[in-house]
């Protein structure tokens, strides 16, 4: 599959493919092309496509995450929505909330009760997106755990942290401070049939395959996008 656009276009393609392991070649014609293999300014696009068809490009296997969102209907029954992401799951304060309060646990171990604008749980791929803007680290794409980053927490003690690939991150909304959070998966807001009670995030069942020119492409992209360094190809 070939995408023409930015990272958002590539994320939509992964979603349309339902995160099946079909190689995706991203060609950057958008605002940000961090996940794409090349742009017209860097390489001859026809040559890039030719390299892909001849099997000369590197296949980068990217871990995904699965989020189970539990909501409670007005009649007390519960609804569960499962969604997958290549980048991240973001739980944020909704338009009618001044902040959200929640408990966060990792594989049953309580980490903290936080108040603030929310939390981002991302893959290594998503570490250069919303998670980075919230203060998280840039993580090599071959890392298969998750990155958890509080968003504008009302404490200086809250810190971003990494999990192992087998961990499950659970977020429980506080009963002491009821709020209506917004939940976005790869930037797409999820509609729930009730009030959100909890979200459980774990590694997804499959990976997304991105085509690029090798592992060094990631670090070249980091220096180009975030530090403004140009690389001669």
Q: Where are the predicted features?
A:
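Short glycine/serine/threonine-rich phosphate/pyrophosphate-binding segments
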Residues: 8-14, 128-133
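Gly/Ser-rich helix-loop-strand patches that form or flank binding pockets
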Residues: 12-30, 34
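Catalytic core of DAGKc-family lipid kinases
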Residues: 31-117
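A generic structural signal for short beta-strands and their flanking turns/coil linkers
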Residues: 61-65, 85-87, 98-102, 117-119, ...
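ATP/nucleoside-binding phosphotransfer catalytic cores, i.e., glycine-rich phosphate-binding loops
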Residues: 72, 83, 91, 107-110, ...
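Short aromatic-centered micro-motifs
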Residues: 104, 126, 183
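Gly/Ser/Thr-rich active-site loops/lids in small-molecule metabolic enzymes
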Residues: 109-157
């Amino acid at each position: 599959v070939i995408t023409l656009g930015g990272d958002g276009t590539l994320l939509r393609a992964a979603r349309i493919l339902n995160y099946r392991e079909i190689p995706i070649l991203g060609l950057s014609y958008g605002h940000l092309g961090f996940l794409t293999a090349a742009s017209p300014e860097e390489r001859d696009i026809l040559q890039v496509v030719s390299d892909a068809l001849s099997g000369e490009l590197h296949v980068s296997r990217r871990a995904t995450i699965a989020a189970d969102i539990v909501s409670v209907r007005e009649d007390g029954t519960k609804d569960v929505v499962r969604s997958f992401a290549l980048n991240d799951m973001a739980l944020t304060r909704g338009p009618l909330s001044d902040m959200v309060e929640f408990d966060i646990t990792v594989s049953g171990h309580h980490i903290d009760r936080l108040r603030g604008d929310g939390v981002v749980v991302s893959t290594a791929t998503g570490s250069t997106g919303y998670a980075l803007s919230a203060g998280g680290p840039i993580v090599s794409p071959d890392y298969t755990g998750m990155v958890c980053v509080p968003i504008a927490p009302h404490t200086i003690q809250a810190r971003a942290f990494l999990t192992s690939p087998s961990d499950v991150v659970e977020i429980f909304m506080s009963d002491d401070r009821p709020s209506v959070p917004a939940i976005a998966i790869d930037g797409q807001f999820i509609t729930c049939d009730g009030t959100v009670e909890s979200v459980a995030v774990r590694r997804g069942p499959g990976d997304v395959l991105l085509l690029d020119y090798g592992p060094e492409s990631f670090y070249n992209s980091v220096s180009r996008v975030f530090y403004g360094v140009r690389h001669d190809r």
